[in-house]
Amino acid sequence: FCATTATIVSGAMAERTKFLSYCVYSGVISALVYPIEAHWIWGGGWLADMGFHDFAGSTAVHFVGGVTACLGAWMLGPRIGKYGKDGKARAIPGHNLTAMALGVFILWFCWFGFNGGSTVAMASDDAMVSAGLVCFNTNLAAALATVAALITSWVRYGKPDVSLTFNGALAGLVAITAGCDMVDPFGAAIIGIVAGVLCIFSVEFFDNVVKIDDPVGAVSVHCMNGMWGTIATGLFSTSEGLLYGHGFRFFGVQVLGVICVAAWVLVSMTVIFTIIKKTIGLRVTEKEEIDGLDIHEHGLTSAYSGFSISDPTYAEMSVNENTDLGEDDITMASEAKINAAVKVVKEEPLPAELDSGMHKVVMICLLYTSPSPRDRSLS
């Protein structure tokens, strides 16, 4: 759980954070921030004594990681090229939806251990029934969150957005984690549906209003839905929930717990990020960000087997290999072919002393022609 809290932060701060800084703040989260708030919630602390309930970590793990991610991304600033001169967000899509899908389904499967395993023991019939309810609610919330995110993106952007749908699945898993043992399937369904919709609007809000650059949507998935799931437990708990006629006390304790944990994380991590920024530095240089952190931070040409980085300086090309559209017949081509074509321009060789890294980046950008529906709406 502690490791999960620390790794959530890396997604929102991706592509521009120094690796050493990542190691330092992850160590501080693991050694200081997480243990204190986890003690408040699970270790017989004051929130536990008040009756605060977080079964498997919507607040203790996901909300803490999400708040830290939001703060870190804000202090880092956006990636180069994320926002134009007019302030509008530009799409920087992920490189591999297949890998994303695989990762989501691995997480979904492992969440049965994350939530179901938090039952700790199955020595009695009651414990086994409880674990069964936990796993059922977990799967139901995730499935309905996925459908809700898909439909919401379809309605808003004209086509279903794959990446947002996957994030919706994770949002449902995060949200149900707090109360999966206290809510019935109806409550789990509502929690999941709201989580899927909330994830979509949250991504838009942070991209376009707050202008916090979160490459993977970690803040929307973990912070916003960790908060929603914890508060929703106060609403839908069959034994103590507000909507089941048990009054405001439990609901109020859930809200208070979220506020106090957020305050602790914001104060402690603001101090830590500020110290890192003033000493070893939090962000890489502009050149390192453009070239890629694989090269400068880890000494790798590329971390992705699907990418082959080569220097095109001396390449001889006369036609567009993608559309077979050369310079001579571009005037007769259809609008669709012109839009799809990558213009080939013969140039003199670059000077030997000029770093070709920028040239590679330009080539990669030119070859990108098909944004997702959400990305088109942001462009």
Question: What are the residue ranges of the model-derived segments?
Answer:
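Glycine- and aromatic-enriched membrane alpha-helices
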Residues: 1-364
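Conserved small/polar residues in nucleotide/adenosyl-binding loops
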Residues: 368-375
